[in-house]
């Protein structure tokens, strides 16, 4: 691959020569040594369609060779094109030799003969790291007359202040530690080791009008997870909605229940839409922390993004959100609702308590127009909600969510007395990313809605209105660029 790429660059150089290089100057690359390990290289976005980084550690490049690092980046993040090596452990005095390449307006441009020396370390967020324990000079090179011994590369671990965050399976974690990172840069869904796909008919408490499947609904594309809603008939055959569908062989729900097998009967047709959902339920669960997700929400009538924290064990009950749910980002796909962003906990299935604790931010534009950074900070004494770095709400339990639930006649609020002041949000939760359609709780009945929430023909009436809602699904994907979890 890299031989082909270098030949391509050579051709560009021959064809356009120095005059083209004078027409555009590639922005200088910013290199950062991440503490305790890692390298980040970035340039500001200037309308590029590709950014490539090629470099060597402590060894000069031989012309336009591929180097130890050779990576093509096809998508910017947060206004910058970024290459990241999370495993390399750099030392003060280390030198990186490199060249970069960009494609702008269909033409290629290089920045050659780059050199950079490690003089300091930074944290993940770019702030200076505490280097009081670092060596102040580069390791002394071995002279030819000295025994050929390896140069020490170990640096003392930084001081650790134990965090309130807890990770299932670990004794303790340090404050500010990056605990979980998914950049979705794998080639295949099977390579997502920390996630498992749902295959089932979702049921209570919201009874959405979709079935979770894998084929055609979950894809990795240009470093993002893409979840796509599709009509069930497109996967099977016309008339499938009045037939039976058995998912038992791959079902992630409870076998021998309607979560895994459905038989249509009269107005009770099969869910007409198939979508995707993945979770870390059996891979990564935690209690308290900062969750950051960069995503582009779906646009289209009756579509609902699922960027959530869900309870691992349903300690306080498995119905009606008795054990809670936390929404990192939630905006309905209908154009009339799309400027309203909501985030926070859901502790009951019905209104008014269902939405009482959710925070709202009205956007200048629809939230589904572009990618945004959504953050939920889950603490021992409350929850903070942020979007693009701006806080738009805080949720405090006060004397406990039980008191508020009892005030609103929530029948299961008494269960929370078994926990702390944050109950039911004081247990282990997992990450979930999915796409839902319709359902019986998220959309209030109105003249424009084709179904009534309490009607036994809700799914059928929704399906019969497809000529109105399906044409609005021209940008219906939920796209997730990354998911990160940090210790408090």
Curated annotation (Swiss-Prot):
Record keywords: Glycoprotein, Immunity, Innate immunity, Secreted, Signal
Listed GO CC annotations: extracellular region
Region Binds to laminarin, but not to curdlan, does not activate the phenoloxidase cascade, is susceptible to proteinase digestion by trypsin or chymotrypsin and does not cause aggregation of microorganisms, annotated ranges: 199-488
Pfam families on file: CBM39
This protein's record includes keyword Ligase: no
Main location as per UniProt: secreted
SUPFAM superfamilies: Concanavalin A-like lectins/glucanases
BP term (GO), one: lipopolysaccharide-mediated signaling pathway
Ranges where the record places region Binds to laminarihexaose and laminarin: 24-127
Binding residues annotated for substrate, in chain numbering: 72, 99-101, 110
Stretches the record annotates as Binds to curdlan, laminarihexaose and laminarin. The complex formation with laminarin induces self-association of the complexes into a macro structure, likely containing six protein and three laminarin molecules. The macro structures may form a platform on a microbial surface for recruitment of downstream proteases, as a means of amplification of the initial signal of pathogen recognition for the activation of the phenoloxidase cascade: 18-135
Role, per record: Involved in the recognition of invading microorganisms causing their aggregation. Activates the phenoloxidase cascade. Binds specifically to beta-1,3-glucan. Binds to curdlan, a linear water-insoluble beta-1,3-glucan polysaccharide, and to laminarin, a water-soluble beta-1,3-glucan polysaccharide containing beta-1,6 branches. Also binds to lipopolysaccharide and lipoteichoic acid.
Family annotation (PANTHER family): GLYCOSYL HYDROLASE-RELATED, GRAM-NEGATIVE BACTERIA-BINDING PROTEIN 1-RELATED
Protein name according to UniProt: Beta-1,3-glucan-binding protein
């Amino acid at each position: 691959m890299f031989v082909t790429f270098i030949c391509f660059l050579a051709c560009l150089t021959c064809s356009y020569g120095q005059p083209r290089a004078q027409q555009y100057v590639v922005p200088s690359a910013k290199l950062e040594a991440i503490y305790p390990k890692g390298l980040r290289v970035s340039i500001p976005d200037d309308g590029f369609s590709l950014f490539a980084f090629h470099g060597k550690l402590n060894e000069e490049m031989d012309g336009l060779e591929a180097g130890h690092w050779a990576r093509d980046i096809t998508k910017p993040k947060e206004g910058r094109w970024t290459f990241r090596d999370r495993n390399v452990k750099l030392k003060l005095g280390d030198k990186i030799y490199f060249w970069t390449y960009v494609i702008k307006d269909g033409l290629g441009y290089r920045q050659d003969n780059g050199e950079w020396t490690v003089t300091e370390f930074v944290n993940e967020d770019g702030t200076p790291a505490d280097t009081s324990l670092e060596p102040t000079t580069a390791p002394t090179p071995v002279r030819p007359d000295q025994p050929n011994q390896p140069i020490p590369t170990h640096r003392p671990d930084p001081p650790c202040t134990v965090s309130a965050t807890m990770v299932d399976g670990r004794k303790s974690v340090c404050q500010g530690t990056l605990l979980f990172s998914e950049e979705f840069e794998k080639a295949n869904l099977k390579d997502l080791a920390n996630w498992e796909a749902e295959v089932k008919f979702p049921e209570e408490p919201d009874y959405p009008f979709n079935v979770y499947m894998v084929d055609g609904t979950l894809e990795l594309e240009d470093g993002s997870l893409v979840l796509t809603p599709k009509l069930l008939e497109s996967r099977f055959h016309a008339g499938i909605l009045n037939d039976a569908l058995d998912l038992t062989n791959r079902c992630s729900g409870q076998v021998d229940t309607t979560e895994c097998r459905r038989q249509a009967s009269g107005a009770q047709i099969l869910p007409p839409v198939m979508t995707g959902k993945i979770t870390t339920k059996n891979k990564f669960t935690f209690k308290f922390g900062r969750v950051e997700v960069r995503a582009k929400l779906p646009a289209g009538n009756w579509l609902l993004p699922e960027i959530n924290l869900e309870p691992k064990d349903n300690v306080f009950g498995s119905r009606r959100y008795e054990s809670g749910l936390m929404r990192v980002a939630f905006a309905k796909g209908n154009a009339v609702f799309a400027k309203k962003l909501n985030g926070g906990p859901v502790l009951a299935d019905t209104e008014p308590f269902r939405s009482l604790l959710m925070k709202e931010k009205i956007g200048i534009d629809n939230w589904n127009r572009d990618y945004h950074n959504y953050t939920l900070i889950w603490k021992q004494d409350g929850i903070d909600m942020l979007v693009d770095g701006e806080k738009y709400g805080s949720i405090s339990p006060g004397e406990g969510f039980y008191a508020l639930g009892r005030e609103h006649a929530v029948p299961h609020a008494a269960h929370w007395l078994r926990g702390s002041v944050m109950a039911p949000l004081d247990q282990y939760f997992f990450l979930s990313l999915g796409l839902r359609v319709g359902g019986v709780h998220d959309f209030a009945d109105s003249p424009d809605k084709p179904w009534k929430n309490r009607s036994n023909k809700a799914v059928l009436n929704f399906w019969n209105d497809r000529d109105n809602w399906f044409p609005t699904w021209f940008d219906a994907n939920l796209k997730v660029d990354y998911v990160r979890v940090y210790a408090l």
